[in-house]
A protein has these predicted regions:
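Patatin-like phospholipase
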Residues: 1-18, 26-185
């Protein structure tokens, strides 16, 4: 969807994302058409990307160092300069472990590294808590999975929502909520 928006030169004023949406959004804002598809296809079967081995070695099923350091810095470089120069405002949502509320960071938080993206993509229980700018954060999707209200609060009057699930999907109540709470204490 984001590549199509690039193809038709649809350039929004504002882009917000949490978790995988934030990771995909930064490539869109930086103008790196095809980058998300390349990464997802090329590394989907790579044990460094996702594996049970990672869970035991790095305390995350996802190879967070591989995803947020090796890929953007070496294997399929992220264009930090183009991202910073883009006129599109970008916001990443994370979940504050201490308050249980969403916290949002502007594109300036992604100037030279992807720590805030890592935090926004760190799934509770399956990934370690990420410390960033004095806070402790996990996956932004746990507190604000579709941040339309934040976009409206920030002044957007028209919103395009790109979902990873069918629009009729309704999330079932969290079965592991009590386990999450105990593990995050």
């Amino acid at each position: 969807v984001l590549d199509y928006l690039s193809d038709i030169n649809a350039q929004p004023d504002y882009c917000i994302g949490v978790s995988a949406g934030a990771c995909n959004g930064v490539s869109f804002v930086s103008g790196q058409r095809g980058r998300n598809k390349r990464i997802n296809i090329e590394y989907a079967g790579d044990k460094r990307y996702v594996s049970m081995r990672n869970l035991f070695r790095q305390k995350s099923m996802f190879g967070m160092d591989f995803i947020f350091n090796d890929i953007p810095d070496k294997l399929d470089p992220f264009d930090y300069e183009a991202f910073a120069a883009s006129p599109i405002a970008f916001v990443t949502g994370v979940s504050d472990v201490e308050t249980g509320k969403p916290v949002y960071f502007s594109k300036e938080a992604i100037q030279h590294d992807s720590t805030v993206l890592r935090a926004s993509s760190s799934i509770p229980v399956f990934s370690p808590i990420v410390s960033f700018r004095g806070g402790k954060y996990l996956d932004g999707g746990t507190t604000d999975p579709i941040p339309v209200r934040k976009a409206m609060t920030d002044g957007c009057d028209k919103v395009i929502v790109v979902l990873t699930r069918d629009r009729n999907y309704v999330k079932s109540p969290e079965k592991m909520r009590s386990i999450y709470r105990r593990m995050l204490k």
